[in-house]
UniProtKB/Swiss-Prot annotation:
Annotated Pfam families: ASL_C2 (PF14698), Lyase_1 (PF00206)
Database matches in NCBIfam families: argH
Gene that encodes it: argH
Name of the protein this chain belongs to: Argininosuccinate lyase
Catalytic activities: 2-(N(omega)-L-arginino)succinate = fumarate + L-arginine
GO biological process: arginine biosynthetic process via ornithine; L-arginine biosynthetic process
Keyword Lyase: yes
High-level lineage: Bacteria, Pseudomonadati, Pseudomonadota, Betaproteobacteria, Burkholderiales
SUPFAM superfamilies: L-aspartase-like
Entry's localization field: Cytoplasm
MF terms (GO), sorted A to Z: argininosuccinate lyase activity
Xref: InterPro entries: Arg_succ_lyase_C (IPR029419), Argininosuccinate_lyase (IPR009049), Fumarase/histidase_N (IPR024083), Fumarate_lyase_CS (IPR020557), Fumarate_lyase_fam (IPR000362), Fumarate_lyase_N (IPR022761), L-Aspartase-like (IPR008948)
Length: 464
């Protein structure tokens, strides 16, 4: 029986009296998605092997053999020659099996003092840390593209909306800066998340630590972790760092989705504020005239996908007792797809920002149609000494009269305006222009072109 059992392919098969069914193998295997972790798995294994040799847990010769074997495995993976086997379950055992084929007993000694539990936790942290750095860089690229667009249109009038109704005039540059602010916070969130990702689980072993005289701090230094995880149970069992990453990613996509909604609306022929370059649009298989903003529409849709992954991970963790459970195998596909979706979306949006054509005349015409300067008239009366609530009421009556007549506030004569307040004088016509309205909001965070340019300069300084 012993000889028969020793032929089984699983690393743990000696405990069992019968082989695992093929159905169970397919159901429990993760290698065809977690092989994405191959490079970080090798990176972690090399650091672990170096520590084992330094601590004299394995010999220097074994260490050299492990390094040699891992170098060949990396080449095989890069060239597509590495054979991934479902029978070996996951990325870890596939690599370990190949290493043993290449270097013999030295490969069998690599797993001394560790478990797949702390191994995979380390792999995921290395992976997430790397992707955070990548995403922060892509957020920078997107912000720079939006800053270019904002700078080009720092003076371009755009109607600002609340409740999808014209509210007050702003500039297109100011509007773009709102998204720059959102994506700046997204980058800050990612970097803050990185602090909690950047802790080393390796050395926790299965759940209780190891009896070998390991040096966890040495491995942490080798892998550029700021610290080690200080409780072995927590180190192998929790995925809160991945959940936090997915939450930050969901916020990125939420901001992208809000921008997408506006781009779709603005590109509509009924609105016509912008056009998006043909290379970011598609047509219809039946309607020859169509030019559809598929990229922002799809980004809007993919946001729900990323939100779903966040909920999946939260649900995955909520019922697990300590320590590691097989449930955690399900953390990878939502995590990987979140990364892919966010990375692809940020890349294409930074590119698409260069293909947005703004139509100032359409924006200006829309700003003239919704009594956008009504608040300016109320502020004018307040500055003349009228309490704000009284000023608000007077202007509301004026707007009502304009609605009935089908004209704008600026179309009223001075005499007609004075019907609503005797405080109104000839200087009111400077106040009621769109340019005058935006220029008057000349403070930090305001829409005045001067402030827009100062804000752009501040952001560029931070990004550079």
């Amino acid at each position: 029986m012993t000889a028969q059992l020793s032929k089984k392919s699983e690393a743990w098969s000696a405990r069992f009296n019968e082989p695992v069914s093929d159905l169970v193998k397919r159901y429990t295997a993760s290698v065809f998605f977690d092989k994405r972790l191959a490079q970080v798995d090798i990176q972690g294994s090399l650091a672990h092997a170096e520590m084992l040799a330094h601590q004299k847990i394995i010999s220097q010769q074994d260490h050299a053999e492990i390094q040699r074997g891992m170098a060949q495995i990396q080449e095989e993976i890069a060239s597509g020659k590495f054979e991934w086997l479902l029978d070996l379950e996951d990325v870890h055992l596939n690599i370990e099996k190949r290493l043993t084929e290449l270097v013999g007993d030295a490969g069998k000694r690599l797993h001394t003092g560790r478990s797949r539990n702390d191994q995979v936790a380390t792999d995921i942290r290395l992976y997430v840390r790397s992707e955070i750095d990548n995403i922060v860089g892509l957020l920078r690229d997107l912000r720079l593209a939006l800053l270019d667009l904002a700078e080009k249109h720092a003076d371009t009038i755009l109607p600002g909306f609340t409740h999808m109704q014209v509210a007050q005039p702003i500039t297109f540059g100011h509007h773009m800066l709102a998204y720059v602010e959102m994506f700046s916070r997204d980058a800050e969130r990612m970097l803050d998340c990185r602090k909690r990702v950047n802790r080393l689980p390796l050395g926790a072993a299965a759940l209780a630590g190891t009896t070998f005289p390991i040096d966890r701090e040495r491995v942490a230094r080798t892998l550029d972790f700021e610290d080690v995880c200080h409780n072995s149970l927590d180190a192998v069992s929790d995925r809160d760092f991945a959940i936090e990453f997915c939450a930050a990613a969901a916020l990125i996509m939420t901001h992208v989705s809000r921008m997408s909604e506006e781009l779709v609306i603005w590109m509509s022929p009924r609105v016509g504020f912008i056009d998006i370059a043909d290379r970011f649009c598609t047509g219809s298989s039946i309607m020859p005239q169509k030019k559809n903003p598929d990229v922002p529409e799809l980004a809007r849709g993919k946001t729900g996908r990323v939100n779903g992954h966040l909920i999946a991970l939260l649900t995955l963790m909520k019922g697990q007792p300590l320590a590691y459970n097989k449930d955690n195998q399900e953390d990878k596909e939502p995590l990987f797809d979140t990364v892919d979706t966010v990375v692809d979306t940020l890349r294409i949006f930074a590119d698409m920002a260069t293909g947005i054509t703004v139509k100032p005349d359409a924006m200006r015409a829309a700003a003239l149609q919704g009594y956008a300067t009504a608040t300016d008239l109320a502020d004018y009366l307040v500055k003349k000494g009228l309490p704000f609530r009284d000023a608000h009421e007077a202007v509301a009556h004026a707007v009502r009269a304009c609605v009935d007549r089908g004209c704008d506030l600026s179309d009223l004569t001075l005499e007609e305006m004075r019907v609503f307040s005797p405080l109104i004088e000839a200087d009111i016509f400077e106040v009621l222009t769109l340019e005058g309205s935006v220029a008057a909001r000349n403070h930090i965070g305001g829409t005045a072109p001067q402030q827009v340019r100062l804000a752009i300069a501040r952001h560029r300084s931070k990004l550079n």
